[in-house]
């Protein structure tokens, strides 16, 4: 940016200019010892090769305000500019309306009125598409590698309402009966209420035939002690984002490492240190990373942790940020470590949200923005909240799946492949499922793929050997 003009204006003249060109002009002017300096945009022109280059030129104040207001490439003050801001994106009226919707949905539960759980997840929106794709993927991998020597064993962690599990078994029953007869579907749920509801589903006429093929467990994935040395498939659909990972933030007001809690039930550990911005050697961890290292090693064998943690450390450096709240997926490492120890011949299919669009509407969306638990600043944080009808807002973060994929290879020594969710569904769904995806521009009105699908990614991890 260039210093274009130097004015000797009084504060009253600046106020008159703001009335003429808009209040944003005040933020575009900076007081100096000699007057006021306007920081203006750079002009752009197109070369013969089609490249955009800039040249510095003087513009009038009126032209600058006009151009930067309506053209996002001309300046910081554009109305179309989509950069970050500290202001709340909703007005008081919109926030009050959303609060009324929340209270309307939560009041029956607070008064003891039983209401069914309404888990807003992406899988139940296109049930047939997901069940077809996951089933075809499992059947192909099973027939190529393990059939007919081993049975098909599936371990599904945090399967929600279990609808996807039942749909997968239905699909195998109708299309791959020889595989269905050798299938055992193990479902690991995190509370007894879901287990009882799922057992009631199995008593219905439609799903009663699957009762002999399903085993239900109630446990935390990080504490479940079940072991299976046979080849098996593990499904982790939106599991990593539900873990409370360790968070780190640079804070000038913290004289020592502190630990605070966000939320009464769903905890996020937040560590403060003054040394996170300094480059340190491999033998001198900064306090936050050292604490993360201790947390990760809890429950690990020392030899196993030391063997791959040096590689994980290098991945962490590329992801580390000192300017905003970030986190290390330390519980994901513990989860992968337990899979490697308790299921040594497993193949993992992991699906999770990789980024979140902050313009998603209110409580009826799969994920909504939540206010940071800091009532003194009232700043919007980058975390999101999954809203359930009979549960409080749970603070989670989008999962950096490219980082998770690298950590997965270090922890399990399996080969990992990552792709977008639309690509996975288009690759493994049947013919009518492929018609769901239309290769058109995102701005087209004929786009049939929900936008939220583009926020999800799939990680496929398989052993490097074949039986």
From Swiss-Prot:
Catalytic activity: L-arginyl-[protein] + 2 S-adenosyl-L-methionine = N(omega),N(omega)'-dimethyl-L-arginyl-[protein] + 2 S-adenosyl-L-homocysteine + 2 H(+)
GO terms for MF: protein-arginine omega-N symmetric methyltransferase activity
InterPro entries, per database record: NDUFAF7, NDUFAF7_sf, SAM-dependent_MTases_sf
Organism superkingdom: Eukaryota
Statement: the UniProt record of this protein carries the keyword Mitochondrion: yes
Any one of the GO BP annotations: methylation
Enzyme Commission code(s) on record: 2.1.1.320
GO cellular component, one term: mitochondrion
The keyword Magnesium belongs to this UniProt entry's keyword annotation: no
Function: Arginine methyltransferase involved in the assembly or stability of mitochondrial NADH:ubiquinone oxidoreductase complex (complex I).
SUPFAM superfamilies to which the protein is assigned, alphabetical: S-adenosyl-L-methionine-dependent methyltransferases (SSF53335)
Sequence similarity: Belongs to the NDUFAF7 family.
Keyword terms of this UniProt record: Methyltransferase, Mitochondrion, Transferase
Subcellular locations according to the entry: Mitochondrion
Listed name of the protein: Protein arginine methyltransferase NDUFAF7 homolog, mitochondrial
Enzyme class, first EC level, given as a word: transferase
Annotated Pfam families: Methyltransf_28
